[in-house]
């Protein structure tokens, strides 16, 4: 019985850890829209204390603060009535957006949850584009957080 409960928790955790490839690719696409020369999944994953899975401690710089704000935005989204756990949550929900001339527009056809999540990702991508990238903070040992 304990193994069954553990398996269920791991399945839920995997879904909430951002493993939905389409949702991840949407955020990736927004970052590429604002920073065309970037490789978002390589550049920003495991940067500082907040960029990537999880996050804790004190952000190490402005870019890390962008990630902390993004994490907090997702936490707010999960509290919305329109964002149901496991159905419409920030880590698994897909939304519609467009990119033109390095400008991101979230579609007016998104439902309330999709619109909120789209704007979380949009604001993070804009934030990333406005702050410096410090290579010393990539793969930072989390004990420094």
From Swiss-Prot:
Disulfide bonds join 33-99, 49-145, 51-67, 66-127, 73-120, 83-113, 106-118. Binds 1 Ca(2+) ion per subunit. The modification Pyrrolidone carboxylic acid is found at residue 16. It catalyses: a 1,2-diacyl-sn-glycero-3-phosphocholine + H2O = a 1-acyl-sn-glycero-3-phosphocholine + a fatty acid + H(+); 1,2-ditetradecanoyl-sn-glycero-3-phosphocholine + H2O = 1-tetradecanoyl-sn-glycero-3-phosphocholine + tetradecanoate + H(+); 1,2-dihexadecanoyl-sn-glycero-3-phosphocholine + H2O = 1-hexadecanoyl-sn-glycero-3-phosphocholine + hexadecanoate + H(+); 1-hexadecanoyl-2-(9Z-octadecenoyl)-sn-glycero-3-phosphocholine + H2O = 1-hexadecanoyl-sn-glycero-3-phosphocholine + (9Z)-octadecenoate + H(+). Residues 1-15 form the signal peptide. Pfam families: Phospholip_A2_1. Its main location: secreted. It comes from the Eukaryota. It is found in: Secreted. The active site is at residues 70, 121. Keywords: Autocatalytic cleavage, Calcium, Disulfide bond, Hydrolase, Lipid metabolism, Metal-binding, Phospholipid metabolism, Pyrrolidone carboxylic acid, Secreted, Signal, Zymogen. Ca(2+) binds at residues 50, 52, 54, 71. InterPro entries: PLipase_A2, PLipase_A2_Asp_AS, PLipase_A2_dom, PLipase_A2_dom_sf, PLipase_A2_His_AS. GO terms for molecular function: bile acid binding; calcium ion binding; calcium-dependent phospholipase A2 activity; phospholipid binding; signaling receptor binding. Activated by trypsin cleavage in the duodenum. Can also be activated by thrombin or autocatalytically. Belongs to the phospholipase A2 family. Monomer or homodimer. This is Phospholipase A2.
